[in-house]
A protein has these predicted regions:
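Active-site anion-handling motifs in enzyme catalytic cores
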Residues: 1-372
Length: 372
């Protein structure tokens, strides 16, 4: 049995994942857990969730939308099966807190025991959910933000009003985007930009060497989020491209795309199967931060489609990760063809150097603030 140097409690997106099949959200916690384990740090994921009724809100919304956008019982059933697979992954692969909490008051009354408390990563600071700012942590215990994301370039005055004092109470703050550093500075808080946890571990830490591929034929894989406008996907172009490549098209979509994508292309996977499809895809199309991250992890050729309309604020995360790895030319716009982007080689040696440099910054951060 391992002897751990430190006990860390992490609050992240547990409540969100209970209602949404979001691959990036679940893997960012898993990756941070695996990373900390390498330093003999025992971590637990605080099971903080909203009241029970809200757990079913997403399913109700999907059911109503399915009726509005076309009768899609198959899609609803697939969502339920995938949600079951997500929960199995959480219970089998993630260290969870012994207790569940459904209010900040209960967290304050009886928080999980730990030497250090961490919030992050993902968009834990996209709003002012009090628990994500670690206000429940007992006096004298260290509070750290790791790669926390605001999910936007600037905050409203209302947002600042709610969170400024909470952020100022942290012992150490790191954020995921450079815009987050500026936001923290505007609150009088010193912050540094660090890697998303998913980039702290390697491909082999997600999938064992030699794992058998699930799809035997050639396929193009897409991961989309937040869009409900068919035209924003350039889906006809992607379909045509996959046909030219003699590859089938597989699309995973959440938060909207699953309601408009033709069912013959739409798939929902367990977390493990989703990774497998990333690993063996011919190429990737995505409009998400973690869609880009896993293209990098599995060294896949990829195209990025920017989000539009209300969801366009999410592009801040996309610009940030592409700039970090010098991959801004992967954005598919009206002036570029899919073939031109996919044919353009990616310098994976340079990607590896950038990743290693930024991993050292994370190592230094935790060595300083976890004393490991």
């Amino acid at each position: 049995m391992a002897i751990y140097k430190k006990k860390v409690a992490i609050i992240s997106s547990y409540a969100y994942i209970r209602g949404h099949n979001n691959y990036g959200s679940i893997f960012q916690y898993y990756a941070l857990q695996q990373y900390l384990k390498k330093f003999d740090v025992d971590s637990c994921w605080i099971r903080y969730m909203f009241p029970v009724w809200s757990m079913y809100k997403d399913l109700i919304k999907k059911t109503v939308n399915s009726l509005l956008y076309g009768f899609r019982l198959k899609n609803i059933w697939n969502h339920i099966k995938t949600q079951i697979a997500f929960r199995k992954f959480m219970y089998d692969k993630c260290n969870l807190s012994e207790r569940k909490y459904d209010s900040i008051d209960k967290l304050k009354q009886n928080p999980p025991e730990a030497d250090v408390y961490i919030t992050g990563s993902d968009q834990v600071w996209g709003g002012w959910l009090e628990a994500n700012y670690l206000t429940f942590v007992p006096n004298g215990k260290k509070k750290i933000a790791y790669a926390a994301s605001f999910g936007k370039r600037q905050l409203t005055e209302e947002h600042l009003f709610h969170v400024q004092a909470w952020v100022q109470g942290f012992d150490a703050v790191s954020v995921r985007e450079m815009s987050g550093v500026d936001i923290c500075h505007s609150m009088g808080v010193k912050a540094q930009c660090l890697l998303d946890p998913t980039l702290l571990i390697d491909e082999v830490d997600y999938l064992p060497v030699g794992v058998e591929r699930l799809e035997k034929g050639r396929y193009v894989f897409c991961y989309f989020i937040n869009e409900r406008n068919f035209d924003n996907f350039r889906l006809e172009d992607i379909i045509a491209y996959s046909k030219r490549q003699n590859a089938i098209l597989k699309i995973t979509g959440i938060e909207g795309p699953e309601m408009i994508i033709p069912l013959r292309y739409l798939y929902q996977y367990s977390p493990e199967a989703w990774l497998n499809h990333y690993k063996y895809a011919e190429c990737i199309f995505t409009n998400t931060f973690h869609g880009i991250v896993f293209s990098i992890i599995f060294q896949k050729q990829f195209c990025v489609l920017l989000q539009k309309g209300v969801a366009a604020k999410q592009n801040e995360r996309i610009y940030s990760i592409l700039k970090l790895f010098e991959l801004e030319d992967r954005i598919l716009d009206s002036n570029k063809s899919i073939e031109n982007i996919i044919a353009k080689p990616i310098n994976w040696d340079n990607i590896k150097k950038i990743k290693e440099k930024w991993r050292l910054k994370t190592d230094a951060f935790f060595h300083e603030y976890l004393n490991i």
